[in-house]
A protein has these predicted regions:
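FAD-binding subdomain of flavoenzyme oxidoreductases
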Residues: 67, 77-79, 95-100, 107-111
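Short beta-strand-to-loop capping motifs
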Residues: 98, 154-158
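Residues forming anionic-ligand binding surfaces in small-molecule and nucleic-acid pockets
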Residues: 1-4, 89-107
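Acidic-enriched catalytic cores of C-N bond-cleaving enzymes acting on peptides and small amides
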Residues: 86-91, 110-138, 158-219
Length: 219
């Protein structure tokens, strides 16, 4: 958001200070926009725009607290150019889902070791490389939030679908144990699907999945 509730506290405190008759010397108030979506306002500030030498960050969610620092952020856009690959004869679609994880803010909650469903899905797919064709994968909905829900559709050899789903369920049981303290309600599902369409070529699908597994998540 451009102005969330926590920012509102800081704005109110700053305006109150500017309106007061306190003998503080010169005080400047700095308000920026789009803090959650790219720091556009802060990035547009040019040298000399403000004269003050000391900056107090009033972006706290609690009155009476002042931050001397904040969580950093990095946005990465990765593009994988792939060739559409026809579905192999005898392969059928299976839909996989990891959902209802707790999620959380990528700054405030990143140290709580919560489940990232994108990486959980990628871990399973990595363990099954060579046993499927990737049709699609989608996870997360905000760049500053830990992914709560992820789904993937893969093509699996028809005579291995039951085994593939069984292996996914066994993987799910292990993950539930791994995150039983932080994400007790995380859910998993695997079922046959009527999805149709080409697959991602196997080499790019492999690189894509390996990249998702390798990307750092957490502190």
């Amino acid at each position: 958001t451009t102005l969330g509730a926590d920012d509102g506290i800081g704005v109110a405190a700053t305006l109150a200070l500017l309106a007061s008759d306190l003998n503080t010397g010169k005080v400047e108030g700095l308000f920026t926009i789009s803090e959650e979506t790219g720091m556009d306002g802060a990035n547009a500030i040019e040298p000399g725009f403000i004269e003050s030498r000391t900056l107090l960050n009033l972006d706290s969610e609690d009155e009476g607290q002042i931050f001397v620092g904040c969580a950093g952020g990095l946005d990465t856009t990765a593009t994988f150019n792939y060739t559409a690959e026809p579905v192999k004869p005898g392969f059928k679609a299976v839909e996989l889902r990891v959902f209802d994880a707790i999620g959380g803010h990528s700054g405030d909650d990143i140290n709580k070791e919560r489940a990232n469903t994108v990486q959980i899905m990628a871990r399973f797919l990595y363990s099954e490389l060579g046993n499927f064709q990737l049709a699609k994968m989608k996870g997360g909905n905000k760049k500053n939030a830990i992914a709560r829900d992820t789904e993937a559709v893969v093509y699996v050899k028809e005579n291995d679908i039951d085994g593939f789903i069984s292996r996914f369920n066994a993987f799910a049981a292990d993950v539930r144990k791994e995150f039983h303290n932080t994400d007790p309600d995380v859910k998993f599902s695997a079922e046959r699907s009527e999805f149709s369409g080409n697959a991602v070529d196997s080499e790019v699908a492999k690189r894509f999945i390996m990249a998702l597994v390798a990307i750092n998540h957490g502190v």
